[in-house]
Amino acid sequence: MSDIHSLLVAAILGVVEGLTEFLPVSSTGHMIIVGHLLGFEGDTAETFEVVIQLGSILAVVVMFWRRLFGLIGIHFGKQPHEGTGKGRLTLGHIVLGMIPAVVLGLVFHDTIKSLFNPVNVMYALVVGGLLLIAAECLKPKEPRAPGLDDMTYRQAFMIGCFQCLALWPGFSRSGATISGGMLMGVSRYAASEFSFLLAVPMMMGATALDLYKSWSFLTVEDIPMFAVGFVTAFIVALIAIKTFLQLIKRISFIPFAIYRFIVAAAVYVVFF
């Protein structure tokens, strides 16, 4: 792969990663399709995808830095408060949201990696879309937690249980957690924010583990390509998160569910 071509591929995949990582549409499904169409597959491609996820994670940190620092007791000025009462989101909420998927992910890490194939991703796209529709149809008419700071520890833990569905490649971590939050009585907006905050430790841990296992596939020659992908993913993810949070104030997740079905059909057409 020529230098110019490899950098172009990196930029395209960075855009795809940044656009889809935090939307409930499955970044995995999109990366599989686009990577296949670009002829960028194999061990190096998998390592590249792990690295550019760090760019997406950095976008969340930049967006929610004040809230994230506040969770660990470091305060800069007045802390944000989004709720109807005096409650506050704590580090305990994040930890409870992490526990179920961390335990299952560590125990079944190799098994989960073996599930990364187009068939499983296609089915996960469909099932995840159905869950989004179910969440919109079955959520309480009046959310019990309108704001992020109204969330209970029980709601955080149950969202963590739903996050386990995202261990199924193609399901979408944000789709699973947001759907779970809505079914637990958390508003669409607050569930999305919690999903983003929960993504930081979850994705950093998973990425660190994957990088450790993929370290041998990294070469000095790949650094420019990986850097372009990382920066592109960061910039695009930053824009995507801001746009998404504004969008869900006006629309439901039904269009995202329909889009997932379209992507599932695309996976079928491309690979079968």
Curated annotation (Swiss-Prot):
Enzyme class (EC, first level): hydrolase
Assigned GO CC terms: plasma membrane
Organism from which the protein derives: Citrobacter koseri (strain ATCC BAA-895 / CDC 4225-83 / SGSC4696)
Topology class, membrane: Multi-pass membrane protein
Name of the protein in question: Undecaprenyl-diphosphatase
Annotated keywords: Antibiotic resistance, Cell inner membrane, Cell membrane, Cell shape, Cell wall biogenesis/degradation, Hydrolase, Membrane, Peptidoglycan synthesis, Transmembrane, Transmembrane helix
Highest rank taxon of the organism: Bacteria
Main localization of the protein described in the UniProt heading: membrane
